[in-house]
A protein has these predicted regions:
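Phosphate-binding site of ATP-dependent enzymes
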Residues: 31-123, 127
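A conserved helix-loop-beta module that forms one wall/lid of the active-site cleft
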Residues: 1-33
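Protein kinase-like catalytic core scaffold
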Residues: 22, 62, 86, 132, ...
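Short strand-connecting beta-turns/loops that link adjacent beta-strands
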Residues: 29, 82, 139-142
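A short, polar/charged loop-to-alpha-helix boundary motif
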Residues: 94-102, 154-163
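Generic beta-strand structural signal
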Residues: 3, 79-80, 138
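A short beta-strand motif that forms the metal-chelation/ATP-contact edge
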Residues: 77-79, 142-156
């Protein structure tokens, strides 16, 4: 993943990613909105120009390598503290490259490998998050982190049958620091 602040640096960015096709995302986008697959350099430039023309608040744009073998599939891991409490595979239902459930994708429970679990916890820690949704895909090079969400949705509970709210509450209870109260009466 690389960041772009303007459309003039596209050549350098594409070189860092190994060329096209690339995924271009508005950093502030959610639910698969503001995400485009640019299959050529010309298309990437056009998308970036359009994003920056409508991007008055200066939000960054992210560019990511398009991993063909993912075939519209990614994995969401729900991390609480130092463990993954639920995980699901998300698959697009049509030819869309986005597997986001809000774009019509379907989810199924999935078991992660030890390597994947460790990577997800490490990704959440790198972002200084104790509760996070880590999105990644399996590739020929191993698991690749796509993004780390600071406020992941709870739809994963329905899909996996796993309770994620309780581990969050338990984590907070274990880690909440108690501060001594100062008695204001008679002070």
């Amino acid at each position: 993943t690389v960041f772009s602040r303007n459309s003039t640096d596209i050549d350098d960015l594409l070189e860092k990613l190994g060329g096209t096709p690339v995924i271009i995302k508005l950093a502030r986008g959610t639910h698969g909105n503001g995400v485009v697959l640019a299959e050529s350099k010309k298309a990437a430039k056009s998308v970036l120009q359009a994003f920056y023309l409508t991007n008055e608040d200066g939000t960054n744009v992210l560019l990511q390598e398009f991993v063909k073998e993912s075939a519209g599939t990614d994995i969401r891991a729900f991390v609480v503290g130092s463990r993954v409490v639920a995980s699901m595979r998300r698959q697009s239902l049509d030819d869309d490259f986005r597997s986001n459930l809000h774009k019509g994708g379907a989810g199924t429970a999935i078991k992660l490998t030890d390597e994947e679990r460790k990577m997800c916890v490490k990704a959440a820690r790198a972002m200084n998050l104790t509760v996070a949704g880590v999105d990644f895909m399996r590739s020929a090079r191993g698991p690749l982190v796509l993004e780390v969400n600071a406020s992941p949705g709870f739809g994963i509970e329905k899909i996996t049958g796993r309770d994620v709210a309780t581990p969050i509450i338990e984590y907070i209870e274990r880690n909440a620091k108690r501060r001594p109260r100062k008695d204001k009466v008679g002070a």
